[in-house]
A protein has these predicted regions:
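Outer-membrane beta-barrel initiation region
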Residues: 22-106, 112, 193-194, 203, ...
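Outer-membrane beta-barrel translocator/channel fold
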Residues: 73, 86-165, 310-339, 454-458
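C-terminal outer-membrane beta-barrel translocator/porin domains of Gram-negative envelope proteins
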Residues: 236, 246-249, 257-377, 393-395, ...
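Residues that define the transmembrane beta-barrel architecture of outer-membrane proteins
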Residues: 42-44, 56-60, 78-80, 92-96, ...
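Outer-membrane beta-barrel "beta-signal"
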Residues: 433, 438, 461-475
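Transmembrane beta-strand segments of outer-membrane beta-barrel domains in Gram-negative
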Residues: 32-33, 114-116, 123-300
């Protein structure tokens, strides 16, 4: 009883408002497999968005989930789902999201659409090809040391301003036995990098209110500006552009449920076609392969082993740099950037690993240590341990194409990195609050293995680790 009171207090603090529009009879239904309330009708979850991401800072804002479970026959999967979010981060980012997913409006077709706007005043940019691009961890650490005021804040060295507008509409239809599906969609995106005065950052804003000795000097160029000067990033694509993309794919899905699966396979293969004639500024053609597997060790969602394998590839040897840090999605989700960060490789710095081709994995052991019903809601708490990893398998061209007077500094920079990338691996764990199998709040911490490496070329190259408060499962 005491434990339940404590948990009730925690839930009340985390979920200040949860509304359900359904009849009284539906509240009494329970599933045969385990005691669980079958949700019907509309379930609304307006919440303050208070979270933390080591890459973006504290998040303040609001979000709204609307789930339509209809007569309950599809529970725990909703018939349709709306999601709205407006968030502001203390490190200078803003995020606005509207997404909609519907399984019944078009007979036999799942329709998903989303529009997102991200404004990053100082987005992480560490260069290309993983460990080939050296990260000066010591200078960053000294700049943050309040006991050593003689070193300026070095973090802007690895930042660039970016505005990203993404819109998409996807359709998924059955091919065989509601397990094999076709996928097709149109994705539009607009990226604006840097500023019109041709530099990565607005240093006046970056240095505002800083002590004079901590000001990032104008003579210290960010990596993004150095890459332009050396010709690694061409002026034709440096400042962003438009992507007009058709996505085609196949999906194999045998999951028992979508929000928090405990058994089944979820595998996808996608083609991304962005030709010039469709309006793309810098045309490219890419592909993506993803395999996810959920293995029940103890039934009824108690203990689950889950893993994801992903490969993001490029046809040919050219793709605009601003499309590289994404794991491709088609369907109810939407693209999120950062090979490194909560949605990709937990524990390493956001966008740390970028290349034309990248392989990654995520492995988790998920344990739900308590399940109960409270206030007509299905509540669960879970723990997980994980390991994530990624590596560049086809490099972005980092050859020198600039003015010869800059070659010496380019050679010195390249000499600091490795001759090729190696696996970036992290370990970590976390706690999850799960309501009605769909609304999930996650608290996780990831630590890069490179932090403990004895090789000075690798040690601390992925950062110090990161703590996240976010929503959902990674996969």
């Amino acid at each position: 009883m005491k434990l339940r009171l404590i948990l009730a207090a925690v839930i009340a603090a985390m979920l200040p408002l949860s509304l359900s529009a359904q009849d009284d009879n539906s509240k009494e239904q329970t599933s045969k497999e385990k005691k669980e309330i079958i949700k019907t009708g509309y379930n609304l979850g307006p919440l303050p968005a208070v979270a933390f991401d080591a890459d973006k800072g504290f998040q303040l804002g609001a979000l709204l989930n609307i789930y339509d479970f209809g007569d309950g026959s599809t529970y725990p999967n909703p018939r349709q789902h709306w999601y709205f979010e407006a968030s502001f981060f203390t490190k200078g980012s803003q995020l606005f999201v509207i997404s909609y997913d519907n399984k019944t409006l078009i007979p036999g077709i799942r329709w998903s659409s989303a529009i997102t706007l991200t404004n990053d005043k100082a987005m992480d940019f560490y260069g290309f090809n993983g460990y080939r691009a050296h990260y000066n961890h010591d200078a960053v650490a000294l700049g943050k040391d309040k006991q050593n005021p003689d070193n300026f804040i070095y973090t802007p060295k690895y930042r660039v301003n970016r505005i990203a507008l993404l819109a998409k509409t996807d359709f998924v239809g059955n091919i065989w036995d509601k397990k094999l599906f076709w996928e097709a969609g149109y994705h539009f995106s607009y990226f604006k990098q840097g500023y019109e005065n041709k530099q990565a950052l607005n240093l006046a804003k970056i240095n505002k209110n800083k002590d004079p000795e901590k000001v990032f000097p104008e003579t210290e160029e960010p990596i993004f500006d150095l890459y332009r000067k050396w010709g690694i990033i061409s002026e034709d694509e440096a400042w962003g552009g438009i992507n007009s993309t058709v996505r085609l794919g196949l999906l194999y899905d045998t999951r028992d449920k979508e929000g928090a699966p405990s058994r089944g396979i979820w595998a996808e293969g996608h083609l991304m076609l962005a030709p010039k004639w469709l309006g793309t500024t810098n045309p490219y053609y890419r592909y993506s392969l993803t395999f996810r597997h959920y293995v029940p060790i103890i039934k009824n969602d108690v203990l689950t082993f889950a893993y994801r394998l992903n490969y993001e590839g490029t046809f040919g040897n050219k793709a605009p740099y601003y499309v590289l840090p994404y794991i491709t999605t088609v369907g109810q989700s939407y693209d999120r950037d950062g090979m490194g960060g909560y949605r990709t490789i937990r524990g390493i710095m956001r966008n740390r690993v970028q290349g034309l081709d990248m392989a990654s994995y995520n492995v988790e052991l998920r344990w739900r240590f308590v399940n109960f019903s409270l206030w007509n809601q299905n509540i669960a708490f879970g723990l997980n341990v994980f390991s994530d990893g990624t590596m560049v398998t086809k490099e972005y061209d980092m050859s020198f194409k600039g003015d010869e007077k800059y070659r010496a500094e380019y050679d010195a920079y390249m000499a600091e990195g490795l001759d090729k990338d190696r696996p970036h691996i992290t370990l970590g764990g976390g706690l999850r609050f799960i309501m009605n199998q769909n609304f999930i709040v996650a608290f996780e911490y990831g630590m890069p293995v490179s932090k403990f490496s004895k090789d000075p070329m690798i040690k601390n190259q992925d950062g110090n680790g990161a703590f996240y408060i976010n929503t959902g499962f990674l996969f």
